Regions:
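Acidic (Asp/Glu)-rich catalytic clusters
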Residues: 339-341
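Conserved small/polar residues in nucleotide/adenosyl-binding loops
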Residues: 360-361
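N-terminal accessory segment at the very beginning of proteins
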Residues: 1-314, 320-322, 326-335, 346-349
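Short acidic catalytic loops
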Residues: 344-356
Length: 362
């Protein structure tokens, strides 16, 4: 089974750090500090429902001179193209090694910095950057990213200024009975490892598409998607042979979650107004894309690589099962298809041809 990472974010043994405010930002460098407030989860009974609320916490760490109760940690913004920005948020003062030049998730052209045409060239994005007492804004003709200082929010807008989505803050719980954990990261009580949990607004009528090859509904709203490779052995479950940490919204934005760690994307399954991204990774490294689906896909594949055009027969009808075990059986199927005028371009033998060869030698 694919791991469901959401369980780690309701563990009472963990320490929770909630994104609170910008403690400083240098627009020239595109870097700043994000303040995180320390919380714990407190059990709570409401009539016949047992749940939990986030409650402020004072650390007992020793020596207290070496640790921060409410740490300031780095946030970084990079201009990628005219339709994309990269947002990286760290959960530790000791930053993990991130070497884009050796990263297999990136296309060679992206690494070289010369993908795209003159208007959308990777690394040459034209964004106007401004700062005020309330926020830092990256804006151009494609859209806008506002980094609100307090309460901290990442706010995405289209070219007309309409809010597409935004991160949630603890103050959003003031008017609700269900106290949803906002944008946070955890420090596990078991081993001090950290994982981050970006939480964004999910709007009424919003539709989400992506996350890789999936046999569930195309619109992922209402689903919890475990983005991790499993062998589902068929199309009857939500397991995925080929998960992809990328999705886009009909509201005009898309996210590439640059991570190979297991991730659980909760698109309004547990809370109708939120997309909750439970990540195994300690860093949020997101590429944010603006525009229509074709624009978003174009920018995403600039970063990760574009597939060459496949041969015509690959777009035809495939006949497959587990499994055809011999050439004779395959030819019999081919004759039956032709005799019954059933179109077919491919007969996929699947496991029948493996024989004694191990998976590692395929």
């Amino acid at each position: 089974q694919a791991p469901d990472m959401s369980g780690d974010f309701c563990d009472l043994a963990n320490t929770y750090f909630l994104a609170d405010s910008i403690a400083g930002f240098d627009t020239n460098k595109g870097e700043g500090l994000l303040n995180w407030k320390r919380y714990r989860l407190a059990p709570r009974q409401a009539f016949n429902l047992n749940g939990y609320w986030p409650v402020r916490m004072q650390m007992l760490d020793f020596p207290d001179t070496q640790y921060d109760n409410d740490p300031n940690l780095k946030i970084k913004i990079q201009k990628i193209s005219n339709r994309s920005l990269r947002v990286t948020i760290f959960t530790s003062p000791i930053e993990p090694k991130m070497n884009d030049a050796e990263d297999p998730m990136f296309a060679p052209d992206f690494i070289a910095g010369n993908a795209g045409n003159s208007n959308n060239r990777i690394g040459k994005g034209s964004w106007n950057t401004s700062a005020s007492a309330k926020s830092i804004v990256y804006k151009n003709e494609s859209g806008e990213l506002e980094i609100q200082k307090y309460p901290f929010r990442l706010i995405l807008r289209d070219a007309q200024g309409k809010i597409l989505t935004q991160t949630r803050h603890i103050v959003d719980n003031d008017s609700t009975q269900v106290k949803l954990l906002p944008f946070n990261f955890i420090k596990r009580g078991s081993d001090n490892s950290r994982s981050i949990n970006p939480v964004f607004l999910l709007s009424p009528g919003e539709r989400i598409y992506g996350c890789g090859e999936s046999f569930t509904s195309l619109n992922k709203v209402g689903q919890k998607v475990n983005i991790s490779v499993v062998d589902p052995q068929g199309p009857e479950t939500d397991g995925m042979y080929k998960p992809v940490p990328f999705y886009f919204s009909n509201r005009g934005y898309g996210f590439f979650m640059h991570t190979s760690a297991p991730t659980t994307a909760d698109f309004g399954a547990s809370y109708i107004g939120a997309q909750r991204l439970f990540m195994g990774d300690e860093v949020m490294d997101f590429f944010i894309f603006f525009g229509e689906p074709k624009d978003i896909l174009d920018q995403y594949t600039h970063v990760t690589g574009k597939s060459p055009m496949l041969p015509l027969w690959t777009f035809g009808t495939w006949m497959s099962r587990i499994s055809y075990f011999s050439q004779k059986e395959g030819l019999e199927i081919a004759h039956q298809l032709r005799n019954n005028h059933i179109p077919a371009d491919v007969i996929h033998f699947d496991t029948g041809w493996f024989g004694a060869v191990s998976y590692t030698h395929l």
